[in-house]
Amino acid sequence: MILRIFGHDFHYECENLCRVYYPNEKIEIKYDGSGDDPLTVETRLFPEDGGARVEVITSINGSVRSAGDKVTAPEDELRDKCELRIAQLMFELLSAETGYTPPWGVLTGVRPSKLMLRLTAQLGEQGAMDYFTKGLLVSPEKARLAATVAKAEEQIVASSRPNSFSLYVSIPFCPTRCSYCSFVSHSITNSNARKLLPEYLEKLSDELGELGGIARELGLRLESVYFGGGTPGVLEAPQLDRLLCSGESSFDLSSLREYTVEIGRPDTVTPEKLRALRIHNVGRISINPQTFNQKTLELIGRNHTVEQAVKAYQLAKSYDFDCVNMDLIAGLPGESYEDFTASVDTAVALSPENITVHT
């Protein structure tokens, strides 16, 4: 598929919207008329007196559609207005061409509830709903969902003090690298990465000390801690113990509302590590099978079995954590809808306190 961009730099939004309609197509962005493809979307912006003119032309397997409009707005708002109008025109043409109307409208790459909160503060509840449905072309059902989630989030945020903060501690190492992963992480099967881990932990402890000092100087109150990765479970129990001790000596943890360590891979879970977490009052852990389909686990490069994931969860439950979370991923390579729902059913049957679904 070719996406042509003329007169603007909205390529990110335009590309994401094309992917909503054609998720399996490789999209090539061009800023000229070169190339030829049966699937082509052309977007244009021309400056005009008092504003700009935007146009969209779609050529899909010989079917050509076009639409355009003049956009007027104050100079400091014109760019955003043009970007939105191009997205609306793309939505109009591609929905007509494909017969598919995306329920989230032109929203891509954003958190709808966060946007809903901001718009509600600016426009009021009805104004925010109108902007979602009429401006962003979100279906009424999804707009109501965003509003419901936003209200729930608002209650949580409102309970935080103005001087509170959260701490994220990164362990960018994993047993192996999963085929789908885009995070910064190093597999400890690599000897260089394995040698680097102890030094990294030493520097990380130093950094925790520095940050703790800054927090005290600013009078900040630590509200939540999250150890993520990577896979924090790659740490041995003594390493985990020392790192948690560093956190305790660097920060006042008396006001914590949530203390999470994402153990990660089920094959890294051991009684010794779980014991260390409980000793240090970690209340929430995450064990991430990602799928309960053995073929998929092998395909994506995770060296654990479905049985190991279940046993790791059962072991963790025996240590009486406040919350055990399980991560699943929708859309893993080769998985069908039925494969994913089977994984969801398995996770639900285990009854963890929380299930997180990533896409």
Spans of model-derived segments:
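Extended acidic/polar, glycine-enriched regions
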Residues: 69-91
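Amphipathic beta-strand/beta-sheet edge segments enriched in Tyr/Trp
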Residues: 39-73
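Conserved non-cysteine loop/helix-boundary elements of the Radical SAM core domain that shape
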Residues: 185-359
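Short Lys/Arg-enriched alpha/beta "domain-start" segment
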Residues: 1-38
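Local cysteine-cluster metal-coordination motifs and their immediate loop/turn environment
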Residues: 169-185
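N-terminal [4Fe-4S]-dependent radical SAM core
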Residues: 97-101, 121-168, 218-219
